[in-house]
């Protein structure tokens, strides 16, 4: 909190302005000397209002004269003065920032920005101004093609710690930091910086553009890492955005990507639940081919990959997710084949406790050696339990039990059997009683 002024210097400052010579290069030094002496008196008297006017007058004097070197020197000097009033210094920085759009010489502009960043470094009361100056300097470096310097300048600014920074502007700043990391293909740091943003912020209606920008960057990171489940979730978040729902063409495109990445995600409980929720969306009716494909993965029935490729191949390959002649697209197409085979193995495991390798290969449309290799990979990843007897070429999907487990299962089966016998006994007794009653009535 600023101190109350001991003396009001506003009238004296008005008199000083009248006494100063016209603003020209000859009189600048004399005028500046008078102003600096007066500024010290005002500052020591804690007259914030007049002090602010004096500081701005000094800056204007040098700016109009085109003495940018003198302006830079005075800014540094004024900030080092003992007992400077925070409100006055904040106003000075804000005022000098208004000069920047009118400076045509790029070197002069950069020097002034650097000076302002230097004097605001570590000062909480001008942290917002420093952040904006940093962003401006970064933009200049980026326009010059120096992406590395632009990224280093912008990303070294810890805006997440700036309490006085407007939250919307803060999020936009962080997203700009992430964008520069992505331009340099630094996906690890880009992912780290996105974690500084709380996604609950995007629940507000007036930040939908920032939400779309955020998830666009998250999708790029997820695609680079082949994190299909994460990418699917990001697309669902975009799909649920009001501005996307208002555009039929847009939400159809996004929903198509949601389905594609849900199918690419390796099977687990979360993926299964996600597929069922997607299938329950009535808007999926507008994509009948993908709706059929989703149902193929939900029902407990075998799918033949050659048939899947024949029916859905042209539609899927036209999507950028499975684009032909693209390394990532070809990889995802191969991954989709794996998901189909994994689904088929789970179906087989539900119906068979033991099966011959050659028979499983026929069901999966794979050679015995390829079947064995694929099965070994899935077992190693703990997708399900299976044991291969190589000499006999038999695969067992039933997990072997120890003595205790066998005893527990036997006990459970006996209990279930006795329960059923008791129910049958009761039904027989009931039937006998009904029969005896009918005979008694007949007599």
From Swiss-Prot:
Protein name per its UniProtKB record: 26S proteasome regulatory subunit rpn501
Gene name linked to the record: rpn501
Role, per record: Acts as a regulatory subunit of the 26S proteasome which is involved in the ATP-dependent degradation of ubiquitinated proteins. Required for proper proteasome assembly.
PANTHER family: 26S PROTEASOME NON-ATPASE REGULATORY SUBUNIT 12, 26S PROTEASOME NON-ATPASE REGULATORY SUBUNIT 12/COP9 SIGNALOSOME COMPLEX SUBUNIT 4
Highest taxon of source: Eukaryota
UniProt GO cellular component terms: cytoplasm; cytosol; nuclear envelope; nuclear periphery; nucleus; proteasome complex; proteasome regulatory particle, lid subcomplex
Places the protein is found: Nucleus
Phosphoserine, modified sites: 209
UniProt key word Metal-binding: no
GO biological process: proteasome-mediated ubiquitin-dependent protein catabolic process
Organism of derivation: Schizosaccharomyces pombe (strain 972 / ATCC 24843) (Fission yeast)
Family: Belongs to the proteasome subunit p55 family.
Residues annotated as domain PCI: 230-402
UniProt entry keywords in alphabetical sequence: Nucleus, Phosphoprotein, Proteasome
Keyword Phosphoprotein found: yes
